[in-house]
Amino acid sequence: MKTRPIIGIPCRYNWESCYYELRETYSAAIYAAGGSPLMIPLIAKADYIESVVEHLDGVCLSGAVNDVDPLRYGREPHRGLGPVIFRRDETDMLLLSAAEARGLPVLAICFGIQSLNVYRGGTLIQDIDSEVKG
């Protein structure tokens, strides 16, 4: 019997209910592609993330309703900045570091691409409407 690769996905945090959650489409897509999705709670501790990543075959950085903290890329928060969830930022950065150390593939979607960009030293436009001319 062939073993499905285990793909870790960081959860979203719902402040109103205090629950971790994950949109069903992420886990369904990973399963349909032959993988086994594993939800990763936002415990932003290096030892925890490293112990989880030891069991993974890949990482999927999912979308989120929040923005990456601009202080991570050397900018001050703009008035158009959305909510920042520091636990998600730090969890993503730790996941990227641990995945890179183990040579694991990473699929980044929406907010996940922003996290990957910042992890690699990039910056972001916080509010396109007011910061981009034309």
Where are these regions (language model features)?
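The feature captures the ABC ATPase H-loop/switch
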Residues: 113
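Conserved G/P- and acidic residue-centered "switch" motifs that form tight phosphate/ATP-binding loops
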Residues: 110
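N-terminal beta1-alpha1 cap of cysteine-dependent amidohydrolase-like domains
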Residues: 1-107, 118-125, 129-134
